Amino acid sequence: MNNKPEATSEDRTFFGQPRGLSTLFFTEMWERFSYYGMRAILIYYMYYSVTKGGLGFDQGTAASVMSIYGSMVYLSSVLGGYLSDRVWGSRRTVFIGGVLIMFGHIALSVPAGKMALFVSILLIVLGTGLLKPNVSEMVGGLYNEGDTRRDSGFTIFVFGINVGSLVAPYLVGWLGLSYNFHLGFSLAAIGMFLGLVQYWIGGKKYLSKDSLYPTDPLEPGDMKKLVVRSTIGLVAFVLVLLLMALLGSLNLTNFV
């Protein structure tokens, strides 16, 4: 069953493109707003002294964390593609990713020190990996094969990315550096929340129902194996952290 919009005058309501493009345009615009807004002040938050509202890292450590953070964000897209194709479908995967990103920014908006920082990094890395590759894939899914609007549609979509990336550092940076870091992170969280709200509402109206389902779903037996292996991996990771804590070697310098 093909639920993609036809190229009729009814769907030419967003710069001559399928109406679903507006939903994805603003979803990715707000996601990039939240991400680049957060990044604009994160390194300052890490190396500013505690008396200035920061965490007191030395500048080299802060720069290393930022580099590792950026690398992990792009590596996590492999996981996002797999879960979309085999487990949740692209539409659900994007929404789950957005929720994780929002809670990642919320974690930073709370003055809870280094623990909140690393919880935030984990949530945003996972969330971005789920959202970013799949929202782009959904843009392509708006068009039937041979639809001449596809290229211009992607151009409009990328424009939304650029708008979010351009505006965020000024707004979040101004709020975070002029007033309070946690207020800046709160604005990033609000941006992702706005993206989720319009994605939820617009998705029901304008996005294909096919995107709710995985394109190559796991068989029941494979799903059970995936859950078991993921659980074993998570338990092993936690045990390693506990062992490092008992040995007194669980500190930032062992990771950057």
Where are these regions (language model features)?
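Central cavity-lining transmembrane alpha-helices of secondary-active solute carriers
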Residues: 63-84, 132, 166-168
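Intracellular loop-helix junctions on the cytosolic face of multi-pass helical membrane proteins
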Residues: 1-17, 145, 173-256
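Cytoplasmic membrane-interface "Motif A"-like loop-to-helix N-cap segments
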Residues: 86-98, 146-147
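C-terminal ends and interior cores of transmembrane alpha-helices
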Residues: 96-117
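Short amphipathic helix-loop junctions that connect adjacent transmembrane helices
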Residues: 40-63, 248, 253-254
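Intracellular juxtamembrane helix-capping segments at the cytosolic ends
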Residues: 130-145
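Hydrophobic core of transmembrane alpha-helices in multi-pass small-molecule transporters
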Residues: 29, 104, 115-131
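A gly/Pro-rich, aromatic-decorated transmembrane alpha-helix motif that marks the paired
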Residues: 39-40, 78-79, 162-178
